[in-house]
Design a protein with these regions (language model features):
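Acidic, Ser/Thr/Pro-rich regulatory low-complexity segments at or just upstream of the first helical elements
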Residues: 1-102, 114-141, 147, 159-164
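Surface-exposed interaction/gating patches
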Residues: 72, 118, 152-241
Length: 287
């Protein structure tokens, strides 16, 4: 069972009055997120790397873990915001603890459980456990006996790892996402309704797909929103026009084009490694 954020039911942004105030949140988001940003050389020294797992292998396992938690989330009909928060928790966890000692499915399930609390999209533990069983067995119709060993195994895994996850995250529940910022940017720079809708859809898929990578640990939500806009405009052939004459749009929002292109290239790496899981989004390298 393959998971593609590009084809998920949660591709389109939710209509939320709070989006109108996104511009006021951008500075706070950038400042708040800084403590969880890591430099490239730090990914060569993760706990998993110290346990003898090459980062190339760790990246693959991280991607599988996020795919698992996303499938569980779709079974539970969770909004994309909750899934992104769960994925961010997942990636942060493995900057503190080794993937060799803590299986990515176990932590993925726990991240879903905790993210539903943090985002106030609560689901019953029973329903989360049943969804984990079905996704793990690759059987959407699987009948789960609540007294079965499999049911109790997943239930115990989630409850046991919840405290471990909380400690690894330093009880930091404020996890900003790029979605509201992205909507603000598309409204700011793309005035044509048809182009804006197409661009928003593609850029939204970029953010969804980026959850399978470590981009949330490398760049702030503001940079990721800008990268999504840049990549989406390339895919949709939509011109993004700055409001101020003589400046590029990324200069107006004070985001480095070097960072934007680096984020796009990380997504190109993901596409090249698993194109069958990327839906219609074809991420290409930016020189």
């Amino acid at each position: 069972m393959a998971y593609s954020t590009s084809k998920s039911n949660y591709l389109s942004p939710r209509q939320d009055p709070a989006l109108d105030s996104a511009a006021h949140d951008i500075a706070w988001v950038h400042q708040r997120h800084t403590n969880w940003i890591f430099q490239s050389d730090e990914f060569k020294q993760t706990p998993s790397s110290r346990d003898g797992i090459p980062f190339s292998n760790e990246k693959m396992m991280r991607s599988k873990g996020v795919s698992f938690l996303a499938l569980v989330g779709m079974h539970l009909q969770l909004p994309q915001q909750t899934l992104y928060v769960a994925a961010t928790m997942f990636h942060r966890f493995y900057m503190r603890l080794s993937i060799k000692r803590h299986h990515y499915y176990d932590i993925g399930a726990t991240c879903i459980f905790l993210s539903t609390k943090v985002e106030e999209t609560n689901r019953k533990l029973k329903d989360i456990v049943i969804s984990c069983c079905r996704v793990a067995q690759k059987n959407d119709k699987l009948v789960i006996d609540e007294q079965s060993k499999e049911y109790w195994r997943w239930r115990d895994i989630i409850l046991f790892n919840e405290e471990l996850l909380l400690e690894a995250m330093c009880f930091d529940f404020a996890i900003p996402t790029p979605y509201n910022i992205l909507i603000h940017y598309t409204r700011k720079f793309v005035k044509d309704d048809k182009n804006r809708i197409a661009l928003t859809k593609s850029a939204w898929a970029f953010v969804n797909d980026s959850a399978r990578t470590t981009l949330c640990l490398r760049y702030s939500p503001r940079v990721l929103a800008a990268a999504a806009l840049y990549c989406g405009s390339t895919i949709c052939h939509v011109t993004v026009l700055p409001e101020e004459h003589g400046r590029m749009w990324w200069e107006e929002i004070e985001v480095s084009i070097v960072d934007i292109k680096d984020a796009c290239n990380i997504m190109a790496d993901l596409y090249e490694s698993s194109p069958s899981n990327m839906g219609d989004q074809k991420y290409t390298r930016q020189d």
